[in-house]
Amino acid sequence: MHNSYSLSKRLVLVLFLAVVATQLFLIRNVSSLNLTNAYLHHKCLISQGKYKPGSQYEKNLNSHIDLIINSTFRNGFGHMTTAMGSPNMVNIIFQCRGDSYQSKCRSCFAAGISGEMRCPRNKGGIIWFDQCFVEITAIEVMEVNYDNNFYMHNPNKVMGDAKSFNKETMAFLEQLALEATRKDNMEDGMMALYSAREKMVGTKKLYAMVQCTRDVFMFKTMCKECLERIISQYPKCCDGKQGGRVLGTSCNFRYEFYPFLRT
């Protein structure tokens, strides 16, 4: 039996069991905080073409997946490239949410690899879950990318003065963006490029986060510019909504009236 990337039966079984076991554990322990790992969206990069079963591209892909799935996931992100400049080049990048590390990040990565079957045998594809995104491409990713951004929002509108709410929420997100790119916001010797807090907006508590993909950004200015750009899209995405987010492969933000992160 073959999945979209023709992974071996053994690898598919290992990934599936890892996803099921970890997700059951997470659901049981964090459901009260609305901490889920729901599938959000995917995009097949059709222009990059397809690969054939048994090809060198497939072998490179499977080798990458094996190496990543057996890593520690300590930093919550990874970027692996092989055969640069050749038709068989495989590039995998994943970023887990700022509160998802180690086993939680591994589980999300495994779910992402399994989810790539939505793009059968495509060399390129991106999939987003609540706690991570996984991108597989046949090209090297070396710059900020806005082409794959998309919006999500709560269909319910805020009660009261929506204009005032929008202003406060955008200011809060802008403040988090500054915190995410502070020089002293370090983690494991690298800039965290992530910030999350809560704040009273009117009579309700608002929870929010911002994050940049750590491996893409060599300089904090790139992260800052990315966050500024997507926060400026707030009026299109989230005008007067009780919750919303802009996601992509370079940076993202989210806000809700309920806790969605681990403390």
Curated annotation (Swiss-Prot):
<feature type="domain" description="Gnk2-homologous 1">
    <location>
        <begin position="39"/>
        <end position="141"/>
    </location>
</feature>
<dbReference type="GO" id="GO:0005576">
    <property type="term" value="C:extracellular region"/>
</dbReference>
<keyword id="KW-0677">Repeat</keyword>
<dbReference type="InterPro" id="IPR002902">
    <property type="entry name" value="GNK2"/>
</dbReference>
<dbReference type="InterPro" id="IPR038408">
    <property type="entry name" value="GNK2_sf"/>
</dbReference>
<keyword id="KW-0732">Signal</keyword>
<feature type="domain" description="Gnk2-homologous 2">
    <location>
        <begin position="146"/>
        <end position="260"/>
    </location>
</feature>
<comment type="similarity">
    <text>Belongs to the cysteine-rich repeat secretory protein family.</text>
</comment>
<protein>
    <recommendedName>
        <fullName>Putative cysteine-rich repeat secretory protein 31</fullName>
    </recommendedName>
</protein>
<feature type="signal peptide">
    <location>
        <begin position="1"/>
        <end position="32"/>
    </location>
</feature>
<keyword id="KW-0964">Secreted</keyword>
<dbReference type="Pfam" id="PF01657">
    <property type="entry name" value="Stress-antifung"/>
</dbReference>
<dbReference type="InterPro" id="IPR050581">
    <property type="entry name" value="CRR_secretory_protein"/>
</dbReference>
